[in-house]
Amino acid sequence: MNSIKLPRTIHIGGKGQVKKLTLGGTSPILLQTMWKESLLGADLLSIVKSLNELEQLGCDIVRFAVPDMDSAEQFVKLTRLTEMPLVADIHFDYKLALRCMDGDTAKIRINPGNIGSKEKTEEVIRKAKDTGTAIRIGVNSGSLPSDLKKKIEEANSKRNLSGDKKALDDEISLLRADTLTEAAARELEIFEKADFKDAVVSMKASNVRETVMANEIFAKKFDNPLHLGVTEAGPLIQGIVKSTIAFYRLLEQNIGSTIRVSLSDSCENEVIAGREILTECGKRQGGIRLISCPRCGRKGFDVQAFVKRWQTKLLSEKKDISIAVMGCVVNGPGEGKHADLGITGAEDSVIIFKHGAITKRLDLKKLTEEEKIKAVDKAFIEELQSL
């Protein structure tokens, strides 16, 4: 059985004021998200502010859709305003990739299923070499080359005529994974002939099983760094579940150099989800680990409201500590005593504790709801800052 290859090391960014990042090898796994809005008419300084906030949450790279030349012009301007390494997501028109590389672009993402002829890809590679820009070959199950699509269509036709659909389903899943790998391999051949070494690869299906199989097959044959993701993963809960299953299975085998949790939700939630997955898989250390109880009828403290109010701020902190937010005195400070800092409540009082020892009690009986929130937040921030 072929073993997983250690991915080659490549560098992205480093132009202008953009941070230089190391990808692959034994480097930490990088966390990405994708900007959710059009660049057309956008306030670029406002985007820079948002990029800074995403960085505080733990984001390393942000990708932007560049569907037309006006968007490419905006993208080039944006690359010169931020330290965040930016990726231009290009489909159909290779000239958009060429224009984006005039900026301080960290990486270009192209899709071999729709970028056009080999000659167009070669022109993109030449400019990438000249400008020191990495390229991601992004293969999606929905946009495979026509001959590979035909293979899958023929297999599906046989399945519809078969009595043993389950057996054929397994074969078709493997075939789909193979076609994703084949599409990537074909494109890589062009890159290798051009002696272009800074190529990252991604192979994504909306099906977890096929995504995992494709990346496993690829990682045994090639040493290009892999970007992991499940395409069209879905809304918040479904998307996180799919991504977590796929990433865990791959990261446990040391497959993957970057990840993105694709969600029909905010960039912030993509980053938070990705960060938590990396932490729980033992692939990222540091930062605040937020623990909270699921709530029940005993609750004396509104865990949900407190977490909603504090989550982004806490996850932006660089302190390497754990914080427990517990709904009642059963869970805190007793079950939360392992935490560096914790908070809970009982009736009209709030308790703040460190390593299970109570450090502060607040009597909220005579306060309005607004005053209660202010008092709790003030006491909590004081204890947090003391750590």
Swiss-Prot record:
Any one GO molecular-function label of the UniProt entry: iron ion binding
Role summary: Converts 2C-methyl-D-erythritol 2,4-cyclodiphosphate (ME-2,4cPP) into 1-hydroxy-2-methyl-2-(E)-butenyl 4-diphosphate.
Protein name: 4-hydroxy-3-methylbut-2-en-1-yl diphosphate synthase (flavodoxin)
SUPFAM superfamilies xrefs: Nitrite and sulphite reductase 4Fe-4S domain-like
Binding site for [4Fe-4S] cluster: C293, C296, C328, E335
Keyword Transcription: no
Catalytic activity: (2E)-4-hydroxy-3-methylbut-2-enyl diphosphate + oxidized [flavodoxin] + H2O + 2 H(+) = 2-C-methyl-D-erythritol 2,4-cyclic diphosphate + reduced [flavodoxin]
Annotated HAMAP family: IspG (MF_00159)
Pathway(s) of this molecule: Isoprenoid biosynthesis; isopentenyl diphosphate biosynthesis via DXP pathway; isopentenyl diphosphate from 1-deoxy-D-xylulose 5-phosphate: step 5/6
Family according to the record: Belongs to the IspG family.
Keywords annotated in UniProt: 4Fe-4S, Iron, Iron-sulfur, Isoprene biosynthesis, Metal-binding, Oxidoreductase
EC id: 1.17.7.3
Cofactor remark: Binds 1 [4Fe-4S] cluster.
GO biological process: isopentenyl diphosphate biosynthetic process, methylerythritol 4-phosphate pathway; terpenoid biosynthetic process
InterPro entries named in the record: Dihydropteroate_synth-like_sf (IPR011005), IspG_bac (IPR016425), IspG_bac-typ (IPR004588), NO2/SO3_Rdtase_4Fe4S_sf (IPR045854)
Cofactors: [4Fe-4S] cluster
